[in-house]
C-alpha cells in the first residue's frame, strides 16, 4: 500500500510514471542525513509534548535499525517516490501506523529534503576543502626544494621572463587558496536550517525550530518558511565554486600535459598516471591529466543545468528541484576524485632542472630587465628603453647573434653608456629573479616568505575545517545513539 497516494489519488500508479519521477537512484546521498533529520525531529516533537515518550522511543529505535540495515536493503519501490517515504514505509511496517505515522507530524517532505541536502552537502564541502589543503601543503613542500630552480615564465605561451619553479608552483597555491576560501564561505550559507518551514507555511503545532537546529548542528535558521523550502542558491553557490575550482585544476592538468611533452621536456609524469599506445610502443601518454581535464568540464555543464532548472520556477517548492540533485552530486564526486588525481600527479612528478634552466636562458627572456637597467642607469623613459631593447632583439635575430654582441652598438647609436657588468647582470636570468624581491615576486627570499605565509594560513584553514567536521561527527554520534 502506498501510504502517500492512498487518500487523494488511490494506490495505483503506472510503473513507467513511478520510474520516471522517482529520485531513489540519487537519494542514497541523503539517506544518512534523512535518518538524522528524522531523529532530531522526533526528539523535538517529544520534548514539545506533541508525541508521547513511548512512541518517540520506538520511532527513534526503529530509525536506528533502518540506518544499520542500510538503504540498499530497504524496499526501494519507485512508487514510493523518494527515500523519505521509503524510510517512513519501512518504519510503519515495523511499528504500525499508529506509532510510526506520528513521525511526520508538523513537517513536510519539502522542509525535510531541504534540510537533508544541507546536512549532506556541508560535509562534502569540508571534505573537498580538506583535500585541497593537503594538496597545497604538498605543493609547498615541492616548492621548498625548487626556490632556485630557474624556469621561463610564459605569456601567450611565448617566453616572457625568468622565474623559478617554486614561484610557478606558488601560483597554483595562490589560486586554489581562494577556492578553499570560497568553499568555507559557502559553508556559512549551507549550514542554515530550513527544518520546521513545513510545506511552505510552517505548522500549527508548537514546534521548536531552535532545538532541531541545535540537534543537527546548524549555525542558524532560515527565517522565512517560503524561502526555506524553495532556496537552492546554496547548491548553485557550491556548484559555482566547484566549477571555478575545476577551471584551476584543469589549468594544472593542461600544464602537466604541455610541460611533459618532448618539446618542453621540463617535467615527467609518473608512470602510474600514464598509458601507452596499442600500436606505438614508444608512447607514454598523459591519460589521467587528459581525462581529468575533460571530466572537469562537466562542472560547468552541471552548474548551467542547475541554473536553468531554477531560472523560471515560481516561489516555494516545485518538483523540478529534485532534478538538480544528480548534477550536484556529480560535481561533488568529480571534484573529489579529480583532486586525488591531480594531487598524486604533482606529488610524483620528476623535474628536469637542466632543461628548465636551458629554456630560462633562451629566447630573450631577460629583455625586460635589460630595458629596466637602461632606465635606471641612463634616466631615459621606459618607453624609449623598450624601443631600444626591441631593436636589440630584432637585430640579434636578424644577425643571428647574442644580445650581448649587439647591445653596445645600439647603445652607441643612441649615445648611451652603461657599465658592462650592469649589462651582463641584466642579461643573467638568475640575477633577474633575485632582483624581483617585491611581495609576490620570484626572488628566492621572497618565495621563502610566501611559503611560510601560505603554510600558516593553510594551518588555520585546516583547523577550521577539522573543528567543523568534529562538530558534524559529534551530531551523528549523539543522534545515532540517542535514547529517550
Swiss-Prot record:
Catalytic activity, as annotated: 2-(N(omega)-L-arginino)succinate = fumarate + L-arginine
Keywords: Amino-acid biosynthesis, Arginine biosynthesis, Cytoplasm, Lyase
InterPro entries membership: Arg_succ_lyase_C, Argininosuccinate_lyase, Fumarase/histidase_N, Fumarate_lyase_fam, Fumarate_lyase_N, L-Aspartase-like
Cellular component GO terms held in the UniProt record: cytosol
Enzyme type, top EC level: lyase
Pfam families in the record: ASL_C2, Lyase_1
Gene Ontology terms: biological process: arginine biosynthetic process via ornithine; L-arginine biosynthetic process
EC number: 4.3.2.1
Predominant localisation class: cytoplasm
Subcellular location: Cytoplasm
Keyword Transport found: no
Record GO terms (molecular function): argininosuccinate lyase activity
Pathway(s) of this molecule: Amino-acid biosynthesis; L-arginine biosynthesis; L-arginine from L-ornithine and carbamoyl phosphate: step 3/3
Signal peptide start-end: none
Highest rank taxon of the organism: Archaea
Family according to the record: Belongs to the lyase 1 family. Argininosuccinate lyase subfamily.
UniProt xrefs under NCBIfam families: argH (TIGR00838)
UniProt-recorded name of the protein: Argininosuccinate lyase
Organism: Methanocaldococcus jannaschii (strain ATCC 43067 / DSM 2661 / JAL-1 / JCM 10045 / NBRC 100440) (Methanococcus jannaschii)
